[in-house]
Amino acid sequence: MRDIARGWRVDGSTIGLVPTMGALHAGHMSLVEAARRENDRVVVSVFVNPIQFGPGEDLARYPRSAERDLSMLRGAGVDAIYKPSAADMYPAGASTRVVVHGVADSLEGAARPGHFEGVATVVTKLLTATSADRAYFGQKDAQQVAVVQRLAADLDLGVEIRVCPTVREDDGLALSSRNAYLSGPERMAAVCLSRALGHAAEAYGRGERNPDRLRAILRKAIESEPLAQLEYAEVVDPATFSTPGSIAVLAVRIGKTRLIDNRDLRLPYPG
């Protein structure tokens, strides 16, 4: 990958990177489309990163659809598909990890210890391997976006972090590779996340700014769904993930499947 990127650099081409873990869906492809519009060359990485999964998480059963992914990416006209192995990324003896403090400590960072250390490490390695000018992430993973933005700024990586809107199903459910785990009833129940965010956005649009009341609105909507178990509901600053703020964020278990979603409450409702 480095040799390919060097050749593009010699030609004066700009490079866009779309990091993925595979199991691609329309949300990923929207990132690819944005990268194609804004760069001469587009690289999509497909790598299920083992060090961002904790004990008991779904590394072994994470959805994988290699042939389908390759077909989608070829059809989208990407210039390179980067599929390193775990041994390529973390050879024997590798002991360096990238740790982002502050923004990575709360919510997802607290619920999944070591997760953002794994994310920050793999993103740094992917950016280095591809010499990307721009890297594309979805707003659905809002805290990951904030962590990567902090990483890029603090390490002077010279890469622009581009954030693209969350892509949703017609009923509001945010697209996620983990949606494949949901049974029929669970899939119907999962709409409670976007419904809760909509209720909070509606209240915010009417002038509600009290974080306790906004959190209560989120909790009530989730707790009204029998199949849902709330892990957290918070309203945070989009850059620091401290409170108070203007981004409503949720983590909810629907059956055994853990889903996250968020919404910028400053956007008009509906929006």
Where are these regions (language model features)?
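Substrate/ligand-engaging "lid" and interaction regions
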Residues: 233
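Short, basic/aromatic-enriched C-terminal tail that caps enzymatic domains
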Residues: 242-271
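Nucleotidyltransferase catalytic core that binds NTPs
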Residues: 1-227, 236, 240, 256, ...
